């Protein structure tokens, strides 16, 4: 619980896409990213190594890979805009970095929604000591 409190406090001062990512997860998956995914498996949260533990952890792995492909963008602080059209999230705006970050976040939120039935509470607050070995390539 302490770790979640720390994450929540840190997010209060964040002006960039971390807050937007949380909002997208809530809109698309209908659950809190901070609560369910800030410390899940080997890839959800800070860091990431080893192999994803399940489909939800793979969503975070793919999200990390998506961010890694961005050049000249800061997914932690860059702000983006999106809108809803007929129930769908549409990333947009004049900033190409913001649009790319939004697309990464949107894909992860959709992945979380689609893998909800495989979410396993044993991977929540999973010790990174269990995530040894080489990471899977993107």
From Swiss-Prot:
This is Acidic phospholipase A2 homolog sistruxin A. The keyword Glycoprotein does not apply. Heterodimer of an acidic subunit and a basic chain. The acidic subunit is non-toxic, without enzymatic activity and comprises 3 peptides that are cross-linked by 7 disulfide bridges. The basic subunit is toxic, has phospholipase A2 activity and is composed of a single chain. Snake venom phospholipase A2 (PLA2) that inhibits neuromuscular transmission by blocking acetylcholine release from the nerve termini. Disulfide bonds join 42-131, 44-60, 59-111, 65-138, 66-104, 73-97, 91-102. Expressed by the venom gland. GO terms for biological process: arachidonate secretion; lipid catabolic process; negative regulation of T cell proliferation; phospholipid metabolic process. GO terms for cellular component: extracellular region. Residues 78-83, 119-124 form a propeptide. Coiled coil: none annotated. It is found in: Secreted. CDD domains: PLA2c. Residues 1-37 form the signal peptide. Keywords: Disulfide bond, Neurotoxin, Presynaptic neurotoxin, Pyrrolidone carboxylic acid, Secreted, Signal, Toxin. GO terms for molecular function: calcium ion binding; calcium-dependent phospholipase A2 activity; phospholipid binding; toxin activity. Its main location: secreted. PROSITE patterns: PA2_ASP, PA2_HIS. It comes from Sistrurus tergeminus. Belongs to the phospholipase A2 family. Group II subfamily. D49 sub-subfamily. It comes from the Eukaryota. The modification Pyrrolidone carboxylic acid is found at residue 84.
